[in-house]
Amino acid sequence: MEIFKLLRKDRKMLFLMFIGTVSFLFIFIPFLKFQMIGSSHKINAYPSLSAVCGLLLGPIYGFFAVMLVTLIYFFLNPKAFYFGIYSLIPPTLAVISAGALSEGKWKYSAIILIVGLLLFYLTDVGRVAFYYPYLSTLALLLILIFREKISKLLFSKDWKKMIVGATILSFSSVMTDHLYGSILGIVYLHLPAEDYISVIPLFIKERLIMTVIGAFFVIFAIEISKCFLKNATKLKEKLLKSYIDKEIKINCKNMLNVDEELLKKYNVKIPSEEEQKEILKTLVEVVVFNNDKDENR
């Protein structure tokens, strides 16, 4: 179950999550910086936060959160943004990619990376340092291989599967940010191919560190949400109702293709929407009860 997608349906929870994420971004962004290639500027590790931001808020609200924080920092200290206003592009695309991927909409994440790779190879630097974005290519391959399974891995009970899902989510968002940042370095700062080639060992280390940090935040957010939901009875009931309503709507659409004459012939009755809701509610409650029972053993 996509916990955060359901949580966002509650306006109060959405507001709290949005404010909490924005505050978290403000606190974390000034720390953990890396030297930028071909420049005296330093890169801070905000790409580590793209995955958890996209996970918590989704692609749309995550986009607005990152945009808000980045714009405020831009107006406070524009010199720190070495690509000018275009510095907004990498983090926003990274959080959109992470948000889409966490909801099982892997095609959007794949498209963002494919477009970035095409843009990179259209440049002179891309044709010379053609092997430079191989980690971004690896991220794309992971998305194409795992697809919607990434979302399922994230919310798996098996902690090993959760780590795999969190790592893929973090790695793909970090490499999306890196790819578009590299393109801006070519277009905006006119960095030569030699700079990109010479820095390959350094950026591998940087991005892997960011991936690990990002995966940690993702796992932490999921575990905290599970503990919270376990003890929030009213919210759990509201989310359960929302989930059931969604499932019933899908089932009702599928039932439009049922042959009514065939049902009458064999005296088969399809339960009403309310009856289906009660049945599904009972089943979900039994499953939740058994899960809680197993965890307490």
Curated annotation (Swiss-Prot):
Name this protein carries in UniProt: Uncharacterized protein MJ0923
Main localization (coarse): membrane
Claim: Membrane is one of the keywords in the record: yes
Residue ranges of the TM segments: 14-34, 55-75, 81-101, 110-130, 135-155, 163-183, 208-228
Subcellular location: Cell membrane
Species this chain originates from: Methanocaldococcus jannaschii (strain ATCC 43067 / DSM 2661 / JAL-1 / JCM 10045 / NBRC 100440) (Methanococcus jannaschii)
Its membrane topology: Multi-pass membrane protein
GO cellular component: plasma membrane
RNA-binding is among the record's keywords: no
Keyword terms of this UniProt record: Cell membrane, Membrane, Transmembrane, Transmembrane helix
